[in-house]
Design a protein with these regions (language model features):
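A cross-family kinase active-site recognition segment
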Residues: 112-170, 186-190
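Short Pro/Gly-enriched beta-strand edge/turn motifs at strand-loop
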Residues: 18-25, 174-184
Length: 190
């Protein structure tokens, strides 16, 4: 079985960024990302850019663009997010079968555990994020639910060869107990 990103080489990353008019300095640094692939790409005589390559067959263009629009809305409401770069009127690009977006490079740091001022600020930001998100529903993004993100994921793990057989009974028991608790929470907060 081939991996969806097996052809996403450093050269292809550079070619993709250059395909829309940015001249790279040939530096590519892979960054942490679970679902997609994200790289810092050096740009000649300018700040590096962040290139996010979306997992093939995972997201529709409409879902990606809806995410971009939401990020722009958050930025307009002074929620500190990093919105994608709009280049020639677009924020989503395609090269060699891969869809990607470019972002300015922004640093950050994790909050200090136990710092109540930082936790309060995080709570405020989450509230603002939810307030902006509540202004209109997402139409193209999969809803976060117990079935699709819980039971379906558990079924995939149990049916595949992902968990050592010796751990399967305990894993399944704990997972089902947790999903039951999550279902109870969703009854009161769908």
């Amino acid at each position: 079985m081939s991996h969806p990103f097996e052809t996403l080489t450093p050269d292809l990353v550079l070619d993709a960024v250059e395909s829309i008019g940015f001249l790279s300095d040939a530096r590519v640094l892979a960054l942490n990302s679970y679902e997609n692939r994200v790289y810092q790409v050096g740009i000649d005589e300018s700040e590096p850019l962040i290139a996010k390559f979306y997992r093939p067959q995972r997201w529709t263009n409409e879902a990606i663009l809806e995410e971009h629009r939401f990020t722009f809305e958050l930025a307009e409401c002074d929620v500190p997010v990093v919105a994608p770069i709009i280049h020639d009127g677009a924020s989503l690009f395609e090269h060699a079968g891969f869809r990607f977006a470019l972002f300015p490079r922004r640093g950050g740091r994790a909050p200090e555990p136990g710092n109540l001022d930082q936790l309060y600020r995080l709570g405020q930001l989450l509230g603002r994020l939810h307030a902006v998100g509540a202004t209109r529903p997402f139409e193209h993004r999969e809803a976060l639910g117990v079935k699709n993100f819980g039971h379906d994921s558990l079924a995939t793990l149990l049916q595949g060869n992902f968990i050592p057989k010796s751990l399967l009974p305990a894993y399944e028991s704990v997972a089902r107990d947790l999903l039951k608790r999550v279902e109870e929470v969703y009854l009161f907060h769908p």
